[in-house]
Amino acid sequence: MKQHVNIALFVPHQGCPKDCVFCNQARITGRKRENMLTEETVRRSIEEQLTTVHSGQEVEIAFFGGSFTGLPRSYQTMLLTVAKEYVVTGRVHGIRLSTRPDYIAPHIMEYLISYGVTTVELGCQSLDDEVLNLSKRGHTAAQVEQAVQVIRQYPSVQLGLQILPGLPGDTLEKSVRTAEAIVELAPDFTRIYPALVIAGTELEWLYATHQYKPLSIEEAVRWTAEIWLPLLKAGIPVIRMGLHASDDLRGEGTVLAGPFHPSFRQLVEEELFRRLLKRMMERIALGSTASLQVLIHPADETALRGRKGESWKQALSILSDTGSKASLILDRNLPRRQLGWRMEEGPVQSLAFTDL
């Protein structure tokens, strides 16, 4: 499969009809709201980013940070006209954009298709109406479903859905139900961004006045793991977990509270490997004199071992207390996100994330 690359162009908060309680796109993207892209700046940015692209990579020009289809039509046309030139000449493979569910309709899709748009991401955030209302999204869960139905009438367009667990009024149960509802909507991919308290948002005020409590890192990891599992079992990729750790987000006074971590996805994978290790320990005969071999794909070794190797050390300690010994074997033939084991030369048994 070809590696995917985005040529990122930011339209922070532009096209949005209102301020959601969690949003400050200028802070998140590092671009100011009033910095409108021009034809010249679009071309310059695309050309600069194309110098880093290698042959064999699948490239999309991606408009991030706002509700693209809410922009003035003349501005949309300027941006898409420039982007389409690169599609027509074969220098990029398509165009990606993000927007609101209530800013999608058949005539809008016809317009986007005419300019070569290949991917639309919808910021659904939650499929619980109470959470959407408290977050001042201005749309309902039903409107998300309607937008998905419209986009699915155009098979050439990939559909992505973004989820923000931990918003006001959210619970683990609601977030899991959102994930299960998303499975029914069958997007091509998803993103999971646990809610953060960003400076300059209404969430900052709610947090300061003790009306909102963000998830801790530990809670966000557990919630995201529970959200990811139904998506994994349905074969729906989660292409990002946690906001990208941009220089602006890392800056002092930007993220005021919440589960921000530069390696958030790895924390979630560590959590699920801990669960697999626990399941494995329940299945093997502790105290056996036979040596235990634990097999893992090399790319998963860090997640299996856990932070500072704690998960693996704990497993070894339990085995040692019962008189058993174990060794870790790296096996490229083992699928990713799967744990295998065998007693000496016995048959290999295995468990995957999808078995949890």
Predicted feature descriptions by range:
Residues 12-16, 193-198, 244:
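Short glycine-enriched loops at secondary-structure junctions
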Residues 28-40, 65-158, 163-221:
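Conserved non-cysteine loop/helix-boundary elements of the Radical SAM core domain that shape
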Residues 60, 94-96, 158-160, 291-293, ...:
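Residues at or immediately flanking beta-strands
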Residues 4, 56-58, 92-94, 117, ...:
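A general structural motif
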Residues 49-55, 86-89, 284-285, 318-319:
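Alpha-helix termini
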Residues 2-5, 212-356:
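Auxiliary Fe-S-binding modules of radical SAM enzymes
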Residues 1-30, 47-65, 69, 98-100, ...:
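N-terminal pre-triad scaffold of radical SAM enzymes
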